[in-house]
Amino acid sequence: MRNGHFITDYHCHSTVSPDGHNTMREMAEAAVRLGVDDLCFTDHIEPLPWDRWNEPPREKHSYDWTAMLAQFREAQEAVGDRIKLHMGAELGECSFAPDVADSFLDDAPPLDFTIGSVHCYRTASGEVNDLTWITSTDPAVWYAACESYFEEMEKLIDWGRFQVLGHITLPLRWAKELHGVELDFDRYEEQLRHVMRRAIEKGLGIECNTNRGHLPLPDGKWLRLYHELGGELITLGSDAHTPEYISCAMEARQELLKDCGLRYFATYDRKKPIFHKI
């Protein structure tokens, strides 16, 4: 417990991820120091070659789970019963090569939790671009990318082999942080409404990504919409890639959920949700 709150973080990365900086042990030990009760590792599992999205998809059954398992066991041994640790994955870009993603999951060890996420979009010429590759400050360029972003999210929901949708308003982060571009997501209300409704119908949740204490993804307006549509399944994750951001702003985001009408947030064990009253 921290400040009267049960603290969880269901989105963090270790050196198992290509963009991670610290081992699972280091992240888990930091979480203990920060008063986290339940930490789930969600390292990147991608069917496309990392940061080379336009190359052919990876070979089926080519993901090696060995490093993840080894690091997770080391972290468990280091922290003992001082914190609950869960092993999950962030399944990125699976809409672009679902058959490869299927093969990775078919070979996977027992996972507690998976996030389905989109970081890329298709250009007008059909290339796969990462949102972080956009160099323009023209909002029109970003809005064009957003149209494709939501199309990929629809395909991701159709695929559906995960528990929650991650950071569904991610373009807001990169447009602002990289180039100071303020996007108006009100123009995507119908797309977001449709995405949320379809996720609810399929029994999938959404993530409230605390974004390291910056703009939550999604923010209050869209969390209220999720609640109004009947959504109840929501997790909290920092998206920490380094120890100092683990569980960042979790108390404030729990209060945000409550203000938006949501009464619970979820943790997972072997892909089964456990609900915690706010």
Task: Identify the meaning behind each predicted range.
Residues M1-P98, L105-D106, L172-D186, H241-C248, ...:
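An N-terminally biased module of ancient metal coordination in phosphate/nucleic-acid-related enzymes
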Residues H5-D9, D38-C40, K84-G88, P110-I115, ...:
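Structural preference for beta-strand elements that scaffold enzyme active sites
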Residues A28, M153-E154, L223:
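Short hydrophobic/charged patches on amphipathic alpha-helices used for structural packing
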Residues L34, P109, W159-G160, L229, ...:
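Structural motif
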Residues D43-L48, Q76-A78, Y121-E127, S148-K155, ...:
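Low-complexity, flexible helical/coil segments
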